[in-house]
């Protein structure tokens, strides 16, 4: 029960990142516009008082402000897309649900435009609808409901006379119905919830604000490894606390209040739950990176320098800390606890110094300049001496503890072989043993990239053993294990099934090819090779592919391809090496030795070949642009979670992969180069 709830919370936290990612762009527009309208910048640059410049500044402020004014609908759309695997139908359903919910609540409560004049009654004008103000929480609820409707009904089958409304078209219909029903209990119970949130947040701040900001910083940092920090900070940033703007509207949430006060040029009272990040991200963590570099073994310092410089710059400029934090989190968890304590103390220190700083994305230098220095509404310069002190503390604490406890931070690892030597014929037996034996197997399956096993007891699975046998990654979702063995996954599954049934009793009877289990093919002799688009469509970053195996590069680097036609073509001159039985994936090797996997859609293995027609055979030579596969795009859109098609280099090793800066492509467009 707990594991299932934890997994759902992680998914929600990740989904919140999509709407949050919009805020930096809005904040940039707002910050620049506000700075040009402010007296501080006008004093040094008097020419910006020009009417045309001020008109542009006003438009910039308005363009940024409109995003913050409509955060509830943005969160509804973003959460729906995030929880539905990126499908736009969920966003349409969320929009339908959002307007129906607000219209129905407004009508049920008899909210009229006249009642909006008193903001204390909890009413607001939402997209032109006089209704009950549910804020960002209301948007998140609608987004989650839309995603539930999508995941529940996207492949529903209806009688033939209602066939037009089957599949994804049924999702907005269900969302309209459920949001209409939801409006009545929401209208009744939400005022009580809102009053409770207000009382809690105001009581928290009034009783001991210093303790509150310390605990916020400390707990938020501790939740990062679990991916739950987005859920934790959302109420503080978007709901807790209130402030009345010049128009008499009640603004809720520390971040929203900060942005509104910056926009109006008002006295700053907000930022308590944001400002503590600046000394840590701009000074503390980069100093920790220096300590990690200096404690690395001499022979590893060159590699560690590259890693730490990149991570430190990322933290300093943007406030993105995960690349640096995850370099020591798992090998030295005590260091991370110390880091969390220092983070909380940073919040407390800036609160005691009466500094009021905020951000739209994170506590990096970019936000520090745009929303701290340029508006010049608070003692922003105090961050610098506090940050210098923090840099000294982080450096010496990290260096001392790393050496004292011999933490295996980057560059200090013990040398050891990462792959167990095993014959190809023995591999299925060893994998079965690592999965806990045949008694532990509840369900066995595979696709072209991974072995999918549902086990009875996850504690019996030897994850490290699976990796030592050649798995490039192991995903754990409840009792479902996914071991990434690449193209040999289906062969391993086939032999494991026969071992379990008793048809195979010794390694010599396995069918897995010897060459498949050898060490990865080396590519030292590969000459520069251009890889072309596998069809007409759009290129997206691999990180946006809604499947961790691909987005986290467990299979290798590459891109995501969103096809807009029903034909997949060869990306280079070469040979077809593998066609999966369900035809949803194809492996190719270029004449120069580059191996590429084209995985058409996400979870399309479950379609059992429906919607795919192979035009080539295994071991058949192909030329760049030659059709490989016909796909029924509409069928895939209706029955697969996503049509995004990862195109992966599976034998890159130490070669350099350059991804071209292109978006809309056709088969004659180069998308990657490896050399």
UniProtKB/Swiss-Prot annotation:
The active site is at 447 (phosphocysteine intermediate), 599 (tele-phosphohistidine intermediate). The EIIC domain forms the PTS system translocation channel and contains the specific substrate-binding site. The EIIB domain is phosphorylated by phospho-EIIA on a cysteinyl or histidyl residue, depending on the transported sugar. Then, it transfers the phosphoryl group to the sugar substrate concomitantly with the sugar uptake processed by the EIIC domain. The phosphoenolpyruvate-dependent sugar phosphotransferase system (sugar PTS), a major carbohydrate active transport system, catalyzes the phosphorylation of incoming sugar substrates concomitantly with their translocation across the cell membrane. This system is involved in glucose transport. Keywords: Cell membrane, Kinase, Membrane, Phosphotransferase system, Sugar transport, Transferase, Transmembrane, Transmembrane helix, Transport. Residues 425-506 form the PTS EIIB type-1 domain. One of its GO terms (biological process) is phosphoenolpyruvate-dependent sugar phosphotransferase system. SUPFAM superfamilies: Duplicated hybrid motif (SSF51261), Glucose permease domain IIB (SSF55604). The lineage of its organism: Bacteria, Bacillati, Bacillota, Bacilli, Bacillales. The chain crosses the membrane at residues 16-36, 59-79, 81-101, 126-146, 170-190, 211-231, 273-293, 303-323, 328-348, 355-375, 378-398. It holds the Pfam family PTS_EIIC. This is PTS system glucose-specific EIICBA component. GO terms for molecular function: D-glucose transmembrane transporter activity; kinase activity; protein-N(PI)-phosphohistidine-sugar phosphotransferase activity; protein-phosphocysteine-sugar phosphotransferase activity. Residues 3-414 form the PTS EIIC type-1 domain. Its main location: membrane. It catalyses: N(pros)-phospho-L-histidyl-[protein] + D-glucose(out) = D-glucose 6-phosphate(in) + L-histidyl-[protein]. It is found in: Cell membrane. Its EC number is 2.7.1.199. One of its GO terms (cellular component) is plasma membrane. CDD domains: PTS_IIB_glc. Residues 547-651 form the PTS EIIA type-1 domain. It is a multi-pass membrane protein.
């Amino acid at each position: 029960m707990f594991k299932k709830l934890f997994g759902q919370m992680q998914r929600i936290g990740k989904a919140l990142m999509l709407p949050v990612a919009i805020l930096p762009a809005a904040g940039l527009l707002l910050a620049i516009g506000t700075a040009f309208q402010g007296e501080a910048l006008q004093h040094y640059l008097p020419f910006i008082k020009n009417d045309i410049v001020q008109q542009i500044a006003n438009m910039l402020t308005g363009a940024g402000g409109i995003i913050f004014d409509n955060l509830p609908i943005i969160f509804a759309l973003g959460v729906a897309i995030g929880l539905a695997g990126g499908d736009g139908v969920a966003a349409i359903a969320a929009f339908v649900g959002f307007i129906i919910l607000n219209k129905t609540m407004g009508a049920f409560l008899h909210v009229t435009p006249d009642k909006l004049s008193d903001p204390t009654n909890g009413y607001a004008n939402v997209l032109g609808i006089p209704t009950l103000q549910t804020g960002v929480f209301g948007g998140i609820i609608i987004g989650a409901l839309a995603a539930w409707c999508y995941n529940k009904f996207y492949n529903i089958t209806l009688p033939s006379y209602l066939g037009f409304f089957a599949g994804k078209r049924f999702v907005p219909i269900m969302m309209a119905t459920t949001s209409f029903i939801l409006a009545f209990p929401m209208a009744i119970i939400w005022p009580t919830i809102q009053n409770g949130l207000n009382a809690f947040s105001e009581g928290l701040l009034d009783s001991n604000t210093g303790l509150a900001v310390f605990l916020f910083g400390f707990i938020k940092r501790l939740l990062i490894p679990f991916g739950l920090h987005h859920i934790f900070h959302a109420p503080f940033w978007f709901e807790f606390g209130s402030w009345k703007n010049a128009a008499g509207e009640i603004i809720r949430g520390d971040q929203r209040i900060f942005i509104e006060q910056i926009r109006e040029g008002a006295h700053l009272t907000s930022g308590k739950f944001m400002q503590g990040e600046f000394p840590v991200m701009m000074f503390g963590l980069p100093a920790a990176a220096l300590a990690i570099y200096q404690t690395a073994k001499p022979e590893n310092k060159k590699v560690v320098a590259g890693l730490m410089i990149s991570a430190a710059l990322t933290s300093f400029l943007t406030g993105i800390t995960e690349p640096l934090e995850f370099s020591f989190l798992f090998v030295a968890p005590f260091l991370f606890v110390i880091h969390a304590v220092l983070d909380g103390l940073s919040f407390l220190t800036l609160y005691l110094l009466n500094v009021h700083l905020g951000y739209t994305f994170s506590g990096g230098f970019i936000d520090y300049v745009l929303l701290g220095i340029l508006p010049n509404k608070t003692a922003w310069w105090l961050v610098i001496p506090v940050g210098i002190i923090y840099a000294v503390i982080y450096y010496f604490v990290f260096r001392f503890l790393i050496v004292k406890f011999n933490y295996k931070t980057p560059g200090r690892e013990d040398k050891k072989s990462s792959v167990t030597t095993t014959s190809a014929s023995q591999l299925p037996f060893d994998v079965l043993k690592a999965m806990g034996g045949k008694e532990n197997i509840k369900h066995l399956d595979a696709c072209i990239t991974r072995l999918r096993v549902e086990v009875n007891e996850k504690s019996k699975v030897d994850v490290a053993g699976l990796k030592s046998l050649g798995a490039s990654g192991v995903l754990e979702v409840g009792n479902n294990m996914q071991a990434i063995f690449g193209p040999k996954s289906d062969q391993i599954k086939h032999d494991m099934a026969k071992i379990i049934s008793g048809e195979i009793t010794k390694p010599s009877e396995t069918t897995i090819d010897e060459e498949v289990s050898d060490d990865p093919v080396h590519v030292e002799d590969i000459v520069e090779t251009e890889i072309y688009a596998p069809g007409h469509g759009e290129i997206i970053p691999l990180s946006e592919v809604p499947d961790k195996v691909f987005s986290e590069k467990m299979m290798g680097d590459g891109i995501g391809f969103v096809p807009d036609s029903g034909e997949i073509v060869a990306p280079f001159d070469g040979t077809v090496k593998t066609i999966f039985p369900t035809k949803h994936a194809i492996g190719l090797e270029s004449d120069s030795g580059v191996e590429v996997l084209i995985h058409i859609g996400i979870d399309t293995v479950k379609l059992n070949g429906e919607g795919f027609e192979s035009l080539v055979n295994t071991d058949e030579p192909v030329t760049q642009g030659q059709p490989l596969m016909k796909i029924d795009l509409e069928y895939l859109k209706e029955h697969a979670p996503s049509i995004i098609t990862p195109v992966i280099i599976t034998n890159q090793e130490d070669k350099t992969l350059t991804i071209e800066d292109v978006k809309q492509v056709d088969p004659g467009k180069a998308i990657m180069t490896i050399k």
